[in-house]
Amino acid sequence: MLQHVVDGESELAKFNAETKKKYANFPEIVREDAHVYKDTDGYYVVKEEWQKPSNAFEKLKLAKDAMKTVIALNEIKTLGEKSGSTKEDFEKFEKELGDGDEIDHRLKWAGLFHRRKGHYGRFMMRLKLPGGLVSSEQMKYLASLVQSYGDDGCADITTRQNIQMRGIQLKDAHDIMINLERLNMCSLQSGLDNARNATGSPIAGIDPLEIIDTRPFTDKIQEYVTGGGRGNPEIANLGRKWNVCVVGSSDYFEHPELNDLAFVPAKSETTGEMGFNVLVGGFISSARAAEAIPLDA
């Protein structure tokens, strides 16, 4: 990701055009009555007539595009250099910054979640591990990183086959991201209004009853969502907790009915060719749940 950072806003349009070119075979369909338009840099923006009334998160995005500043212009490095090592340093840094949204919200586009109430000045970093796959080399690095923070460091395995690390200091974030990229991992677009970790079969490739191996498909989804680790503005302004999965067997380990977008393997009745049935609109939270419905496409 960080090796692709641009030098200034004048290069953003070119930067995003290169990303889009990689996916030129993906049709871009925007309805005439859509509430958004694409600006000159390639980022989707809510049309003025739909900006009021708006919820707090939408107002935050309208004020400053997180993908544009935090990711493409590498604001993480700049913020990290100013944030210091101690709680007192961080308090001074935040006071001088004068923008709590930058710390508490926009950094989530880079997978950094400030623990303001429970652990001020420390961050939880959520990765993106498509299908939950992690090598021994990758895990050793993650373990050493958590260990380096002593009693402040710990890690979680999430319900979406992912890993998130706690106790991270902002001053270290840039170097951590470089190491993640070196090891073919990233934390990009893992929080707030982005597609969450693409899940697949937990026993993909070794399940004797699997219909398809989900690993190549979750990898492709990861590649698209993150723009190959450089950020993809085409899919960086969604609703919160947007979930996608690929089903590998009839056991439905992936709970496709509870995902926003789910691909379920199916064989064509006419050609015998393998493909997918597509489900959309699944949702679950402590407040409500909705079952995904088939597109029949």
Language-model-detected regions and their locations in the chain:
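Internal alpha/beta scaffold segment
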Residues: 284-297
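Helix-rich interaction surfaces within compact, conserved domain-sized segments
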Residues: 81-91, 108-110, 130
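Short, well-ordered strand-loop elements centered on a beta-strand within folded domains, enriched
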Residues: 269-283
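Small-residue-enriched alpha-helical segments and adjacent helix-cap loops
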Residues: 2-32, 38-39, 43-49, 59, ...
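Extended, compositionally biased low-complexity polar/Lys-Gly-rich tracts
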Residues: 76-79, 100
